[in-house]
Amino acid sequence: MSNVYWPLYEVFVRGKQGLSHRHVGSLHAADERMALENARDAYTRRSEGCSIWVVKASEIVASQPEERGEFFDPAESKVYRHPTFYTIPDGIEHM
């Protein structure tokens, strides 16, 4: 058995009817091309996808749920992002 470890890639597939990619799984591959081909073979067997993204797991940076308060607090001071000062015209029932 080899001691060589291939990097881990996260796989995102966009369905034919979808507008966004969704995470479908992970796989190990020697390079990006192999990751794309393996992702195609493993995650789009029934031709349900129209686009695949593969991203090295080591390159993904994410916020942590336990830091959400301090991370998202700066958005509270940007009142222009909240539609509270718009008036809704008469006759509009659902917005």
UniProtKB/Swiss-Prot annotation:
Provide a GO biological process annotation. phenylacetate catabolic process
Pathway, per record: Aromatic compound metabolism; phenylacetate degradation
Pfam families under this entry?
PaaB
**Listed InterPro entries:** PaaB, PaaB_sf
Induction per the UniProt record? Activated by cAMP receptor protein (CRP), integration host factor (IHF) and by phenylacetyl-coenzyme A (PA-CoA) that prevents PaaX from binding its target sequences. Inhibited by PaaX.
* Role description: Component of 1,2-phenylacetyl-CoA epoxidase multicomponent enzyme system which catalyzes the reduction of phenylacetyl-CoA (PA-CoA) to form 1,2-epoxyphenylacetyl-CoA. The subunit B may play a regulatory role or be directly involved in electron transport.
Protein name listed in UniProt: 1,2-phenylacetyl-CoA epoxidase, subunit B
Q: Which gene encodes it?
A: paaB
